[in-house]
Amino acid sequence: MTYNTWWIKKDRNFGDLLTPYILDYFNIDYQYSGIESADIICVGSIARHAKDNTIVLGSGMINFRKEKLNPNADWRFVRGPYTRQRVIDCGGTCPEIYGDAAMLLPWICPEEPKEFKIGIVPHFVDYEYVKNTYPDYNVINVINDDPLEVAKEISKCTSIISSSLHGIIAAHAYGIPAAWVEFSNKIKGDRIKFK
């Protein structure tokens, strides 16, 4: 069976582009589709887009109180307990299985040798500011058509500072200590995805 699958492509954002790599890893046959016909959604703060019977694999939210999550979606696992609680609050059921599918990065993209003591992974809205403010640091751009290149750059660091959720998740997946930082107030949502 071929599954219609949706992920956010327009911003070329690291985390958003990981879904096809994860499905490939599990030999799941898929084709990109619009959200209205998606059978599967996976990586990203996209849980609010699940329709009736959409299979949700590790998606999360950006705003706890404002997002209406579809109780009729097939919630296999979600990013964290806040997303699960919101599914339940909206009348759905969801097992107590948590994790962002990006935690599988070390199996998909093996770790690179260490080159940098610190890597800074700004959210794409913060990139220019951080690049210009910290020119002497290894600033990793999450906007890349190949998200595995971003993962490789993160894996080359011994520690990560990030305003990007998937910068932190990737670091944790590779066993790299990571700290979340806010460089601006430009990131959408109520920061629930960082909890």
Could you describe each region identified by the protein language model?
Residues 1-195:
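Active-site anion-handling motifs in enzyme catalytic cores
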